[in-house]
């Protein structure tokens, strides 16, 4: 009986971890009409959070599906428009996970703060999402991201972002 109790407790303890790793991407979604995009806003927020979570594994079909969902939603959204500055390409360094993190971070912040139009704030929040995902990937091999992590810790990220915007 004590073995059964231990097994049950082990399963209960593991269930929050298992729940965190389940992809929030809706199945069979359609993104054509403006109302389609509106109805999936909660899943967009959940997907960005899921992709940024340290427990979400890289290189899986679930992660690829989440990236695809976000890019499709952002590409057609009538309410969110993401601005990709030249520095973003250097920061994401041809890493699709980091690029999707930037796009998702911007979209997530825009959805949660619909009146925010300041490009410094939007770029900074998107960049913070990139830095979180970069750390989750091990935080190696990208000098720009490593530099920005230090600047963020020093509270100097807003100045850096402002200096790297094409329109100030």
Predicted regions and their residues:
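Positively charged n-region of N-terminal signal peptides that target proteins for export
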Residues: 1-4, 20
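N-terminal signal peptide c-region/cleavage motif recognized by signal peptidases
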Residues: 14-16
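N-terminal secretory signal peptides
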Residues: 20-88, 162, 168
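Mature extracellular/secreted ectodomains of secretory-pathway proteins
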Residues: 61-167
């Amino acid at each position: 009986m004590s073995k059964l109790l231990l097994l049950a407790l082990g399963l209960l303890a593991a269930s929050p971890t298992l729940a965190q790793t389940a992809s929030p991407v809706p199945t069979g979604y359609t993104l054509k009409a403006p109302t389609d995009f509106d109805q999936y806003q909660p899943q967009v927020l959940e997907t960005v959070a899921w992709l940024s979570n340290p427990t979400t594994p890289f290189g899986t079909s679930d992660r690829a599906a989440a990236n695809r969902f976000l890019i499709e939603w952002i590409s057609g959204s009538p309410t969110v428009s993401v601005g990709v500055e030249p520095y973003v390409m250097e920061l994401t360094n041809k890493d699709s996970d980091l690029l999707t993190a930037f796009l998702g971070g911007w979209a997530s912040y825009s959805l949660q703060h619909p009146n925010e139009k300041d490009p410094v704030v939007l770029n900074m929040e998107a960049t913070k999402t990139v830095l979180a995902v970069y750390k989750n990937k091990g935080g190696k091999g990208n000098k720009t991201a490593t530099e920005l992590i230090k600047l963020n810790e020093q509270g100097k990220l807003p100045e850096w972002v402002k200096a790297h915007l094409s329109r100030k």
